[in-house]
Swiss-Prot record:
It is an enzyme of class 3 (hydrolase). Belongs to the glycosyl hydrolase 14 family. Keywords: Carbohydrate metabolism, Disulfide bond, Glycosidase, Hydrolase, Metal-binding, Polysaccharide degradation, Signal. The keyword Protease does not apply. Binds 1 Ca(2+) ion per subunit. It comes from Cytobacillus firmus. This is Beta-amylase. The lineage of its organism: Bacteria, Bacillati, Bacillota, Bacilli, Bacillales.
Amino acid sequence: MTLYRSLWKKGCMLLLSLVLSLTAFIGSPSNTASAAVADDIQASVMGPLAKINDWGSFKKQLQTLKNNGVYAITTDVWWGYVESAGDNQFDWSYYKTYADAVKEAGLKWVPIISTHKCGGNVGDDCNIPLPSWLSSKGSADEMQFKDESGYANNEALSPLWSGTGKQYDELYASFAQNFAGYKSIIPKIYLSGGPSGELRYPSYYPAAGWSYPGRGKFQAYTETAKNAFRTAMNDKYGSLDKINTAWGTKLTSLSQINPPTDGDGFYTNGGYNSAYGKDFLSWYQSVLEKHLGVIGAAAHKNFDSVFGVRIGAKISGLHWQMNNPAMPHSTEQAGGYYDYNRLIQKFKDADLDLTFTCLEMSDSGTAPNYSLPSTLVDTVSSIANAKGVRLNGENALQTGGSGFQKIEEKITKFGYHGFTLLRINNLVNNDGSPTGELSGFKQYIISKAKPDNNGGTGNKVTIYYKKG
């Protein structure tokens, strides 16, 4: 009997142990289960690039978006429209009409202060240059970019022009003054950081001879840019002798310090991995970092007290030539992205949200494209997560079906705070009827969003980013 009781007791203890272990296993979330979108995620749609001419049709489209759970529409507020008449001569009437239409539909409105040119890039269907009077404010050498072959690019003001910050500050101030009355429908504001609204150089521009999957070209060949590079190197090392020691060169004058004279050779001959190459690439990115700090500070100064919402900027998804053995990461570096860790830290320092693109794309890392967009999304997202930088996403090209599933995977895995789809006509026809893609967008993206319980008037976060 004693033996029976002992065995029975041991059996009960074993059973209890198994039950407790099973309970602990069930109660502990797996890595997959713990991955989730952010609590405040919202789904948004990008409006047309060009001006609205048929407001009746546009309002029907907006109503369809609202009825299907879309939170906000994101809009380029073109500098070339609002300040075209002259310096500090603003006309915001078109965008007030636009905001009224959005408000009437019960949607939120996310403006992008678009200080870049529209036209000439993938997906551009309009031609909106920068205000023409800008040319009287400085020299072309100061205000424009110039690439390896001498092509001068005026898609956006060069960050190296001393007047860039002042012009943006005046634009931001006027926007805040004119749209303070619309703050109930503005949950976020985006800043254009450069070409196509992205914080980058205009390295891949078809008019300059670029075509996919070309690496693009460095944009540091104005005298202003060359002198800035020389000054930065002299400041870093303290003297030409110390520069020569670091680089293993025999320069006799600071004027002999130049950006790479042969962009292809810079990679194929290994120059990118030399002390000189690393210094150049680091400086080249630092120009963008400083620019982000300038526009971020101006935006916070003008917007925080008026709107009290998050402000964001954009990094481009330069996903090709990433694993090219002869030119690794050459496309990213021509665009100004050398060290993502350092660049994303600047977003943290400037208190800006980060938007990234190409969430719908899959890797295909073979020649000639060497394209790794999914890997790039993971890299950027992981760094942002580690630094506590809020993430928002967008598609690079028109998408649907499996692309929506890929987007769902990324926004869930990395806790994205929102997603904006390019572009409204992909989801809604001009007569307001849904396209075949709207159901997929609802299933995979809108279904992740949180209901707006503020009657269309509360401030929440949404997102926008421009192509990759």
